[in-house]
């Protein structure tokens, strides 16, 4: 009886060992199958990615080079282009060459004849007369007075008349100045005396002056 029990126990132990050995084999098979499926999936993913990348590259090339595709040249007329021009075209008009007048000898001769017949007017220079400068400090002497041919009584009155000082100026109050400025002032007629020119001698200037009976205060003093 004991031998049978031991035999049964041994058989059970062997069966368990066999079961344990079969489980890792299945796991290995399952793992190998899963690895194959993973590799297949990776290959599909890589293929899809490569296709997408190539498509994007093609789109970029189409955007960068829109006219990269070959286009057929279309001519407006089917016949060949002639290399020679048609003979119906009129010849080009040539402009006549105009010779300037100064190159022709006949025109030069006519111009010389005209110049000989009508000579150019030459401007005559004005003669420059010597001008004696006249200064205000110049004074009359007795010989100059005698050469003027003035009457003797007028000359004696000029010679014997003493020099009189100028009258003192009168100061007016401010009210009188205002009254004079407000009143209408009538113009006083004065005799026009010709202004002595520089080129005019003294004798000619004194001939224009009229004899004055009163005291004479001329611009030129008489030296005795």
From Swiss-Prot:
Resulting phenotype, residue 152 to P: In variants A1 and H
Effect of residue 121 to Q: In variant A3
Similarity comment: Belongs to the beta-casein family.
Keyword Lipid biosynthesis among record annotations: no
Tissue: Mammary gland specific. Secreted in milk.
Keyword set, alphabetical order: Antioxidant, Hypotensive agent, Metalloenzyme inhibitor, Metalloprotease inhibitor, Milk protein, Phosphoprotein, Protease inhibitor, Secreted, Signal
Native species: Bos taurus
Protein name: Beta-casein
Cited function: Important role in determination of the surface properties of the casein micelles. Casoparan acts as a macrophage activator, increasing the phagocytic activity of macrophages and peroxide release from macrophages. It also acts as a bradykinin-potentiating peptide.
GO biological-process terms attached to the record: negative regulation of canonical NF-kappaB signal transduction; negative regulation of inflammatory response; negative regulation of lactation; negative regulation of tumor necrosis factor-mediated signaling pathway; regulation of blood pressure; response to 11-deoxycorticosterone; response to dehydroepiandrosterone; response to estradiol
